Amino acid sequence: MSHYEGDLRTPESARFAILASRWNARITDTLVAGARQSLAGNGIAEANIDVIRVPGAWELPLVAARLAAAHEHAAILTLGCVIRGDTRHYEHVADRCAEGLMRVQLDFGVPVLNGVLAVERVEDAEARAGGSHGNKGEEVALAALEMVNLLEQLP
C-alpha cells in the first residue's frame, strides 16, 4: 500500500503566481504580504514569485486560467476579499469566483489555491488578514507548497 503526503519541500526553480484583487486593498495587501513572506520563508526566491493584480474577485478565474494555460507556474495563489452588503451581489461574486477557480484547477491540472475571503463584515476580514485568525495569505502559500510537492510524488 502506497502512502502519499505533500510537505513544504519544493524545487528552488518552481515559480508561483499570486493573483490578488485590488478591491478591499487594505485586506488584500496584507494577504499578499503574508503569502510572499511564507513562500520566501520556505526557500522560494523573490524572482520566482509573480504578483498580478486584478480589479476584483470576479476577474480572478480568467487570469488564473490564462496563467495555468501558459504552464509557467507550479501553483497559482488567488487572494481577495468579498464582504457581504445589502444586495445579493456578494453571493454571485463569491460563489462564481470559487467555482471558476476550481474549474481552472481541474481543467489545467495546476494547483489553484482559493484565498478569497468571503465574510460578513470587514472585522471578519481583518481577523483573517493578520488578526486573531492568522493570515490566510500565509496559509494559502503553505498549501500551495504542499500541493506542488504532493503532485510531484503522485504517479
From Swiss-Prot:
Claim: Transferase is one of the keywords in the record = yes
EC top class, as a word: transferase
List keywords of the entry alphabetically.
Answer: Riboflavin biosynthesis, Transferase
Q: Where does 5-amino-6-(D-ribitylamino)uracil bind?
A: W23, A57, W58, E59, C81, V82, I83, N114
Annotated residues that bind (2S)-2-hydroxy-3-oxobutyl phosphate are located at D86, T87, R128
Question: Which cellular components does GO assign to this protein?
Answer: cytosol; riboflavin synthase complex
One of the GO biological process terms: riboflavin biosynthetic process
For this chain, the annotated S-S bridges are none
User: SUPFAM superfamilies annotated for this entry?
Assistant: Lumazine synthase
Q: What is its EC number?
A: 2.5.1.78
Query: Which pathway or pathways does this protein act in?
Result: Cofactor biosynthesis; riboflavin biosynthesis; riboflavin from 2-hydroxy-3-oxobutyl phosphate and 5-amino-6-(D-ribitylamino)uracil: step 1/2
Similarity field: Belongs to the DMRL synthase family.
Protein role: Catalyzes the formation of 6,7-dimethyl-8-ribityllumazine by condensation of 5-amino-6-(D-ribitylamino)uracil with 3,4-dihydroxy-2-butanone 4-phosphate. This is the penultimate step in the biosynthesis of riboflavin.
List the protein's name: 6,7-dimethyl-8-ribityllumazine synthase
Q: Which organism is it from?
A: Stenotrophomonas maltophilia (strain K279a)
List the gene name.
Answer: ribH
